[in-house]
Every structure is written in structure tokens, then in C-alpha cells.
Amino acid sequence: MNQIRQAPAASASNATESKQEIRNYTMNFGPQHPAAHGVLRLILEMDGETVVRADPHIGLLHRGTEKLAESKPFNQSIGYMDRLDYVSMMCNEHAYVRAIETLIGIQAPERAQYIRTMFDEITRILNHLMWLGSNALDLGAMAVMLYAFREREELMDVYEAISGARMHAAYYRPGGVYRDLPDTMPKYKQSRWHKGKALKRLNAAREGSMLDFLEHFTDTFPQRIDEYETLLTDNRIWKQRTVGVGVIEPDVAKAWGMTGVMLRGSGIAWDLRKKQPYAKYDAVDFDIPLGTCGDCYDRYLCRVAEMRESNRIIKQCVQWLKVNPGQVMVENFKVAPPKRESMKDDMEALIHHFKLFSEGYCVPAGETYSAVEAPKGEFGCYLISDGANKPFRVHLRAPGFAHLSSMDAVVRGYMLADVVAMIGTYDLVFGEVDR
């Protein structure tokens, strides 16, 4: 596929002789390519099938989220956080509400902290299942997507039961969470797809509360992960496509500011849940999976192992929440809305609710940086308040932006087919990259 052009004849005597010059050619990868994972436009300079240079172009999903958050009261921007990395919704909310809580000087009740920890890990599993299915599909393994979405659907039902939305939950609030865990789970209804014994089997775990459902999920999920690994871990085609591809040395990972699996896959044990614990991560037991070679295969193994660790954390949170009832919102009426029951017969409570959600509340002047260990890496929120009811400045630290910056250094020298594997291993979502 090299571009070949014929050089002009040097003189009349050798006019019949021709000289060929081989030069590199340029290829546009995306933004319409199905493996671009959104709107990535990657301009590749190719020498045959080998990548000489990669130039990622971003901005096609830029929506001005930071400026939007600066134009609204603090408590009205939580919904914007869901729409950044729209596969890791509640983790984004967590960073933002923690920043507000730090400036106000409040702390969520212990039960709310456990609920946040549990839903952070549910979100991590949701993200990794999406990554596992889509990355395998990019490399030609279609069945894995069908397996992964089987469990993902169950956890999406948990999102819907707690917030009413399958994706953009807006469940975390400064001072706690929107509401306590429900006593019932939504059930499948009889249809042409669900009927008879299959319907009873699907609803068997949904007879009790959400905690009962999650307890059943944590008991069965390890076997489901074993099924994913049966399909991929020792699959020779999968290993040929990922082993030794996209190797990132530890010093390179640190130099580019990588976090999350991109860093731990290279053997560096940096995890904010362990190094700078927040919520209730210091009260639960879990390990940090590490890679040894820093290639795509190691990062795959790390993400699969992380799902097992997230399952352990969820199980511990469920056990604690079952025996420890309590408040899920601070009793600080500056940030906490009145109870719904009181608004039915108390005009003052109704006015309080209206003003809280229409005008918000003033946050003391100051600045803070709050970060969480999101599924893709360190997601941070740098927040500046000037004492008004709106932020003076909101800056969001998206892990995908730092990772994408290293694309040129990582993909050079690899084949064109390997670029798909490397884009997949980055686990990019352009809602957070472009913001």
C-alpha cells in the first residue's frame, strides 16, 4: 500500500530508465471507525503496515462541562458529572460531591459512606464488563460481549432501583446520598422472551431487598468471571493479539501521568483506595492486582482481577449495611433537603425544598482538590469557591486525557492491526477526555 511515484528522467540518455521513491502514507483512523470508541480521530503515518507516528485529534465531543458547572449552583451540577465518563457514572459524582463537602466542612454519615463505597465498586464492575466485551469484540471475539452484558444488565437494574435511571443516576449528594437502599427489586414481567421456568429463575433473587439481591450476585459473580476467562485467558488467538503488544515501561507510565490499570499493569502499586483512602475503603479488605510485563494482556488480567476484588468489597459492604441501619444524609439543613413527608403538610419545608434546589447554597471561600480511584484511573475535581452559590472555577482531571496523550509514544513501531488492541486497552470514553 506504499505510495509510489515515478521520478522524472535525469537526462535524455537514460530517459527510458525510471527511479522509484517509496515514501510513507497517512491514514485517518476514526472518528467513524467502530474501534475508535467514540469520536477519536487518530492520524497515522504508516510505513507499509508499521506505524511511524500517531497524532490523536480530540475535541469532537467537547461540551464545555467545566464552564457549565461554573454557571449553576453547586448542587445543580451533579448531573453533569454522570455525563463525563458515562460508563463510570457514580465515581464521577463522588469526586465532585467530596470536593463540595471539603469546602463546606461536612462529612457524610457512616452508612452513606458504605453505600458510596459499594456503588463505586458496582460502577467499577459495570465499566470493566463494558470494556471486556467491547475490547474482545474489537479483536474478533464476539461471544464475550454477550456474556458480559448478562451480568451488566443485573447491575444496571440496581442502578435503576436506587435512582430511577439506568445510567445517569445523580444519586450522590453533598452530605450523603439521595435515599436509603430500597426494600424491593424490580422484577421481570412475563413476555415472549421471559416466561415459564426461565421467568421464575430470573426473579428468584429479586424476591427480597436490594441487599439480598446483591448478596446473591456476589455469590454467583466469581463463577461468571471464570466463564469470561475460559473464553479469553488461554485463548491462543487472544494471546497472539495482546501479549507483547502495547508494552509500557514503568518509567514511561509515570512520565505520562498514567493512573489506574494503565499504571498498575506496568507493575506500579498506586491505587488511591489504598494510598489515600476515602469513603470506607480503609475498613474493607482487598488487594491491588499488578501486571509484570506492561502489555495489553497484563492490563486485561488486571481488569479481570479487579472485578474479583470489587466483588469482595461489595460483599463486605452488604454484610455491614444489613446489620447497621442509620442516616444516609447529614442533618444540616443548609445542604440537606427536608423529608418528603414533611413537605405534604408543612409550608416552611416546601419553601425550604424549593429554595434549596432553585438557588442552592453558598459555599465558604476556598479551594480544594478531591480525587477518587475511578475505573479508568484517577478522576479528580479541582474546585474554587469565592463564597457565592456557584463555583468560581471547576477543573476536572480526566484519566483518559493523560492516557491518550501517550498514544504516539506507545504505538510507534507496532502494526496497524495492533493499534485497535492498544486503543481498546486504554479504555477511552470521550465524554471525559473532551469534557
UniProtKB/Swiss-Prot annotation:
Pfam families: Complex1_49kDa. It catalyses: a quinone + NADH + 5 H(+)(in) = a quinol + NAD(+) + 4 H(+)(out). It is found in: Cell inner membrane. It is a peripheral membrane protein. One of its GO terms (cellular component) is plasma membrane. InterPro entries: NADH_Q_OxRdtase_suD, NADH_UbQ_OxRdtase_49kDa_CS, NDH1_su_D/H, NiFe-Hase_large. Keywords: Cell inner membrane, Cell membrane, Membrane, NAD, Quinone, Translocase, Transport, Ubiquinone. Belongs to the complex I 49 kDa subunit family. NDH-1 is composed of 14 different subunits. Subunits NuoB, C, D, E, F, and G constitute the peripheral sector of the complex. NCBIfam families: NuoD, PRK06075.1. This is NADH-quinone oxidoreductase subunit D. It comes from Xylella fastidiosa (strain M12).
